[in-house]
Every structure is written in structure tokens, then in C-alpha cells.
A protein has these predicted regions:
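N-terminal secretory signal peptides that target proteins for export/translocation
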Residues: 1-6
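Cleavable N-terminal signal peptides of Sec/SRP-targeted secreted and luminal proteins
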Residues: 8-25
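Polybasic, lysine/arginine-rich low-complexity segments
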Residues: 585, 601-603
Length: 617
């Protein structure tokens, strides 16, 4: 083949390139959001600013999936949950859109694990019997300051304990359930140099170095704002409160915490030994009160100097049965402090009614601050023996097994627990607003004042499971198998090619072209963040391999053609016969290795996924 003969190949190569690559252009606002909801007014009367929509997901498109790499907004994790005495495994198969809602299903499903016992230092086979889902916008969409509103129907039955639905925000430096990323980072919101505390805060204000783009002498962390954690169970009088189950908990979790004379669980705190100034709703019909059942956790480490206290400033408000049968709204209004750490507030509302508020000055007892970190959104249903299960453990019961249908476990389960499955947590929308011309309100996961990108890049294993190639896979734009265009979202979203795979139109992405693409219109980006101009382009692996093979073949054949042409001319001058040369291509080889990222040492049992065949059935 002569060089001229490659023109048709190059032509078809360019056509294929144009068909396979699409610049993904869209804002984070879902086109399905009605125009009326593009702006909102704050419910806090002292806030006179105008707010505009910066992010939304209406979940109108049925069939969306959230496996790592499937969706630009959300990642449904696929891993065991190490935290909070969890009884569930998180699977991306338990999250999808249907009938105009995001459906997070919680089902009975056996998952086998190779567990590690920190006391005996030995591995053993273990199982979990519940499967659920958690969706995160971690390192995809983050924001600092603004208004977040959800509409959701809670899962299960209001009078049956065990399910733990939650809608919450977390600082981008920690990835929820990846315990290696949260240790010494969660839930710090502290920017003072305290020599006694610096060893337990990884990025502290005593440090003069600015590794990973961090500013020197600046404390960083991953605080948590819980918009709703719903507690179901039998309606009975609870100690130290007039609130009964079911109820909603609204919390700010920060560190460092109160170290001495801490409140006793189930009792109100002593005056002067806990935070003060928080505002509650005193209306009898919608009354909210301090949550006496959760004041935070102690994160125990060795040596003792590394142990630290995390505090939860939490309030409860009662719910009725309608929260489990139809949609209700949950809102938080969050204003970060000024650059000096002073001020700021968080205010919670349910169905437009005030529930609870925390101001910056309410945190003075420890010196922590209202969060100013870029935070991401989390939606999940957990099942944990620490949430809604019998406390204390009933007499004569070991409370060590929680399997439905096993007579030995029945005593440890809440009444009616096994009838809760399957349960559906249905979310109608997520909408996030920010104030116009407010410099404290920024978009992006690695903003200029509080960057995260280089730190995450430098500690990737903390944000990964064993076998992962990277924390987040690039978003697939098309490529799913199809038989008709309807399989690819219809003509508006994409087409089904003659070869039987989806090709997405601009502004749509995901393997079946079902998700609206997204990008930041006014992103705050750290100068230390390395950006690549084509970051929003996805190259399928098969396409990359094809390009490499075509390029190698083109170069080899072109060089051989030139060589043969030169030899042919020399032989003609010498009167020799023409030469027929053949090129033999040697196969290339590659190695794909990955390291297993074990969670840090804890005083709890931690797990890693193994082949189910290794677990006795």
C-alpha cells in the first residue's frame, strides 16, 4: 500500500473520531427543573440576599444508573461500610431512577467478606445480610455556602426500627465510608494552633509547610452537616426529651470536641460544659429539642496523644406517618464565616418550618468554626445495630448476629424489622442555591481558598478500595449495547448505532445517554490545581486501543513502504529483481497491578470483599 492509499483510512479515522468524542457542555442545573424554582428566597428573615439555582437533579429520566463512571453528578459506591456498626453492604445495583424519583432500595442480600479482627490480628470469613445504596457527589460537584433543599419520602415503616435514611453534606477532604480518608481529618473545622491537638489534626494551623497546595498555618478538615437522619421505632416516652419516635435529627459534627465533663448519653448537658446559644423551635406543634442521645464520638488511637474527640451539636424534631407515605421537604441554609473564622450560621427547616440553628459564636467553647470547606452531597440508607436496635442488649441475647430468619438472631432485632424489606427511599429532587455576588459562596471541589485536588491526588489510596484503578472512573459517554434508539434515551439524548451501541448527543452522557452533563460556570479553582483543557472529554478504552493500533499500523506500514520504495529503486539501478518484504508485528504486553488499601487500624472489625465461594453458605 502506498502512502496515498492511506487517505481513505485517514478519512474514516477522522469521521470515527468526530462520532466518538463529544465536548460535554451543560451547567449543573438540570434542564428538567421548572423555571419557577431557578431562584429562591431564604427562610432566614435577616438574610436579604437574592439566591439563584446553581445545581439541581430532578431525577425525571427513568433508568439512570450510578455505577462509578456512569453519571456526572453521583457515584453509587460499591463496597462494604466499615462505620457505625453497619450491617449492610453498599451496592450500585440498589440505586436507580424510576417513575421520576431516585430510588435507593434496601434489600435482603447475602454478601461474603474476608474480615480482619484487630484483636486477634487474623482474617476470617464473614457475611452481611442487607444490601443498600449510598450516592455521593464527592470530587464531582461541591459547593461552599448556600441553600440545599431535598424532597424525599422516607423508607420503611415509621414504627419499625432498623433503617437509617440520611441526607447530608461532608467536606471533600474525606470520602464517606473510606475510613482511611477520614482519620485525623473528619470532622475538623478548626483553624487555631494548639500544640496539644496538632498531632490529631493532620492539616493543622501549627504547620509552616504548604504541601499539596495547602496554605501554611491553616487548619483544614472535613466537617459534616446532617440535614436529616431519620430514627424509626416504637412510639414510647424517651428519657430527657418530649420528642418521640419517629424523629428527624439535624446535626453539625465538628472537631476538636469538648474533652472534660462531657454530657452523659440520655441526659441533658450540665450548664457551662456544653455548647450554648443554639436556637430551637418552641412551637408545641413543631417543637424541636436538643438531641440527648448523640453528643459525638471519641476516635481512639495509639499512642493516646493521637486520640481526639468529635462533637455533634444535634437537635430532634418529631415526624408523623405521612413522612413515610409521601414527599416532604428538608432544607439547610448555610453561610460560612468570614475569612477570620468569625460568624456564619447553619439553619435547618422541614416543610418550610424552622427546626434548629447554630451560629459561629455558639462554638466558642472549643474554638471550632462554622464550616468553610467545600462540601459534597450524600444520600443513603444505612442499617446499623447502633441505630434503632434494642438497647441495652436483651437479657440472655448475645446481640452478635442480625440475620432475618435465624432463630438465634431474633432476640437482637427490632420488632417487625424483617418485614421492612424491601424498603425504598424515594428522592424527588435535590436543589442547591447560592447568593448572588457573595464571595463566601463558591462552587468547586478544590476552591482557591481551600484547595483539595493535590492532597487527594497525593493520597489516592485513601479514597480507593482494593482493586480500584482510581478513585473515580471517567464518565462514560455512550457505549452501552442497544437495539433501538429508545435504549439510548430517545432521539433527544442519543442514537443506537448500526453496530449496536449508544452514541450520545451533546449535553447528554452516561453509558445510555440518560444523564444531563454538567460543568461549573463560575468555578473557584486553586492556582495549584493542575487542569487539562480536555478534562470533560471521555475516550472509551476500546477507542483508545483502536487509535493506538491504527497509529502503530500506519507508521509501520508507512516506514516499510518508504523502505521498499527505496530498495526497489536501488535494485532497479543494479538490475536486480524486485524485493517482496514482509513485516511481522510482535505482540505488545502490559501489566495491570493494583495495591490493596487497608483501612487504618481501628478497634472495630473491618472488611474487604472476597470471592463469595470462599465463604461457607
Amino acid at each position: 500500500m502506498t502512502a496515498r492509499g492511506y487517505c481513505p483510512m485517514i478519512k474514516w479515522f477522522l469521521i470515527g473520531l468526530l462520532m466518538s468524542i463529544h465536548m460535554i457542555r451543560a451547567s449543573w442545573v438540570d434542564p428538567d427543573t421548572p423555571e419557577y424554582y431557578k431562584t429562591t428566597k431564604p427562610m432566614y428573615r435577616e438574610d436579604k440576599r437574592q439566591y439563584e439555582l446553581v445545581f439541581s437533579d430532578e431525577f425525571e429520566q427513568d433508568g439512570r444508573t450510578f455505577k462509578n463512571g456512569d453519571d456526572p453528578r453521583w457515584t453509587a459506591i460499591n463496597k462494604n461500610d466499615y462505620t457505625n456498626e453497619a450491617l449492610h453492604f453498599y451496592s450500585h445495583d440498589n440505586a436507580r431512577t424510576m417513575k421520576g424519583y431516585l430510588n435507593i432500595s434496601t434489600t435482603q442480600q447475602i454478601n461474603g467478606y474476608r474480615a480482619f479482627n484487630e484483636k486477634t490480628k487474623k482474617f476470617y470469613a464473614d457475611k452481611k445480610y442487607i444490601q443498600s445504596a449510598m450516592l455521593q457527589s464527592w470530587n464531582k460537584f461541591c459547593f461552599t455556602g448556600g441553600i440545599v433543599e431535598f424532597s424525599a419520602r422516607l423508607p420503611g415503616k415509621p414504627d419499625v426500627g432498623g433503617l437509617w435514611p440520611a441526607l447530608w453534606l461532608l467536606g471533600n477532604l474525606a470520602r464517606a465510608t473510606y475510613v482511611g480518608s477520614s482519620d485525623y481529618v473528619w470532622p475538623y473545622s478548626y483553624n487555631k494552633c494548639d500544640p496539644r491537638k496538632r498531632v490529631s489534626q493532620e492539616i493543622n494551623a501549627c504547620s509552616s509547610v504548604n504541601h499539596y497546595g495547602m496554605a501554611p498555618f491553616t487548619g483544614r478538615g472535613a466537617p459534616e452537616i446532617d440535614i436529616i437522619e431519620a430514627m424509626q421505632g416504637e412510639k414510647e416516652k424517651l428519657p430527657s426529651t418530649n420528642i418521640t419516635r419517629p424523629y428527624q435529627s439535624c446535626s453539625l459534627q465538628v472537631a476538636p470536641g469538648v474533652e472534660r465533663d462531657r454530657p452523659i448519653l440520655g441526659l441533658p448537658p450540665k450548664q457551662g460544659h456544653w455548647y450554648s446559644g443554639m436556637e430551637y423551635n418552641n412551637d408545641n406543634a413543631t417543637r424541636s429539642e436538643l438531641n440527648p442521645f448523640f453528643y459525638g464520638v471519641t476516635l481512639v488511637h495509639t499512642p493516646k496523644a493521637y486520640t481526639y474527640q468529635a462533637d455533634a451539636l444535634s437537635a430532634n424534631v418529631g415526624l408523623n406517618a405521612s413522612f413515610y407515605t409521601r414527599q416532604h421537604t428538608y432544607r439547610v441554609e448555610w453561610d460560612p464565616p468570614d475569612e477570620d473564622g468569625i460568624g456564619g450560621y447553619i439553619r435547618w427547616y422541614t416543610n418550610g418550618v424552622f427546626v434548629y440553628s447554630i451560629k459561629g459564636e455558639d462554638l466558642n467553647i472549643t474554638g471550632s468554626e462554622i464550616p468553610s470547606e467545600a462540601m459534597y452531597v450524600i444520600m443513603n440508607t444505612a442499617v446499623a445495630s447502633s441505630w434503632g436496635f434494642p438497647v441495652p442488649c436483651p437479657s440472655g441475647c448475645t446481640c452478635e448476629c442480625f440475620e432475618c430468619g435465624n432463630p438465634d438472631c431474633e432476640c437482637a432485632l427490632p420488632s417487625g424489622y424483617c418485614d421492612n424489606f424491601p424498603a425504598a427511599f424515594e428522592i424527588d429532587y435535590v436543589r442547591i442555591y447560592q447568593a448572588k455576588n457573595e464571595p463566601k459562596h463558591t462552587l468547586g471541589c478544590s476552591p482557591e481558598r481551600k484547595p483539595t485536588a493535590l492532597f487527594i491526588e497525593g493520597h489516592q489510596k485513601r479514597y480507593m478500595e482494593g482493586g480500584d484503578r482510581r478513585p473515580l472512573e471517567p464518565i462514560r459517554q455512550g457505549g452501552a449495547f442497544c437495539t433501538k434508539t429508545a435504549d439510548c434515551g430517545g432521539k433527544r439524548h442519543g442514537i443506537c448505532s448500526d453496530r449496536g451501541f449508544c452514541i450520545c448527543h451533546d449535553n447528554y452522557t452516561g453509558p445510555m445517554c440518560l444523564a444531563h452533563a454538567g460543568f461549573y460556570e463560575n468555578e473557584s479553582i486553586s492556582e495549584n490545581t493542575i487542569e487539562f483543557g480536555w478534562a470533560n472529554i471521555y475516550f472509551p478504552k476500546s477507542f483508545v486501543a483502536l487509535i493506538i493500533l491504527l497509529a502503530i499500523g500506519f507508521l509501520v506500514s508507512l516506514l516499510e513502504t518508504v523502505r521498499r520504495h527505496g530498495r526497489h529503486q536501488r535494485y532497479q539501478k543494479l538490475g536486480g529483481p524486485p524485493v517482496d518484504l514482509h513485516v511481522h508485528k510482535m505482540p505488545t504486553s502490559y501489566q495491570n497491578s493494583s495495591d490493596y488499601a487497608l483501612p487504618p487500624k481501628q478497634k472495630v472489625v473491618t472488611y474487604c470483599v472476597i470471592d463469595g465461594r470462599l465463604v461457607d453458605q
